[in-house]
Amino acid sequence: MNVLNRRQALQRALLNGKNKQDAYHPFPWYESMRKDAPVSFDEENQVWSVFLYDDVKKVVGDKELFSSCMPQQTSSIGNSIINMDPPKHTKIRSVVNKAFTPRVMKQWEPRIQEITDELIQKFQGRSEFDLVHDFSYPLPVIVISELLGVPSAHMEQFKAWSDLLVSTPKDKSEEAEKAFLEERDKCEEELAAFFAGIIEEKRNKPEQDIISILVEAEETGEKLSGEELIPFCTLLLVAGNETTTNLISNAMYSILETPGVYEELRSHPELMPQAVEEALRFRAPAPVLRRIAKRDTEIGGHLIKEGDMVLAFVASANRDEAKFDRPHMFDIRRHPNPHIAFGHGIHFCLGAPLARLEANIALTSLISAFPHMECVSITPIENSVIYGLKSFRVKM
């Protein structure tokens, strides 16, 4: 199967799963798959799907058995660190880690708090607002823009780019797939050109931002090339926008949905880190990851052959009854909480500390600012690779 056909097969397999589930409440489908077909094979598209915690963790984390490297066409995000195997992954990761140390993240905490407070002030006098549009979307976009060292004036364009890069075709028709790939390729060309210009500026005039750190960072005497930096910047833009936006929205929805939790967090803000971890488990922003088998291996009594494509449903694993007590309950005091919402192994999410920091500040500040809040309405994102809300209206 060639590169394009592999990409299309994965998209079709994801759409097959999406069509069997409610956009924001896929959990009954996950539960039925864990019970009836924990390792299933899509004959039409030649793609495996795994749903149990131990199986998902193995597929996602075992670098000897499963590869993240899928040959891409001209794709900046496709050529980023998430789609690399060692030794190239090791080299890139060791360099970019320098931009995400606890010390670097700690330096950004006051600014993230400042941005959060400024956003809350804009809607503090209203009786109702859209939590996504007014808060959980702009906050991560502004933060990641400043972290990368690019003007936040590009915020709307950033959102358009990142939305497109995580989108999927409207349906399984050849026309829809062709139009989707053409639009996505155009988007990636625009992003690559944009970041190439920013990187050149930082080489000539470095500042206190992540791109400058990466431009200056050296590993065994080598600096990262533009070809290595551009995909990583694209990945940061997309992950920094989509994942954190959906984490904040999903967390607040879960908090409001569960009686007494909002009031408990208002009285005990020290519980917020645990609440964020539980939100990651309960409503994972990235519900599915994909891998390719590097050699023949057995999972759940099924032979997965070398070269087979596998979809690992992280959101299902995080609700596996064999791993979590009362998995369908949102419990902010859950301990331990070994969720795998940020992945596992060498591809554990590099931006996890930033996402956690933003979510903790955002949710604590929101709950502190409003003595009462309730959900008015939600509109889910119709997408098979990300999980979140397009709109989330709340009233105070």
Swiss-Prot record:
Heme binds at C349. It comes from the Bacteria. GO terms for molecular function: heme binding; iron ion binding; monooxygenase activity; oxidoreductase activity, acting on paired donors, with incorporation or reduction of molecular oxygen. Its cofactor is heme. InterPro entries: Cyt_P450 (IPR001128), Cyt_P450_B (IPR002397), Cyt_P450_CS (IPR017972), Cyt_P450_sf (IPR036396). The keyword Iron applies. Its EC number is 1.14.-.-. Keywords: Heme, Iron, Metal-binding, Monooxygenase, Oxidoreductase. Belongs to the cytochrome P450 family. This is Putative cytochrome P450 YjiB. It comes from Bacillus subtilis (strain 168).
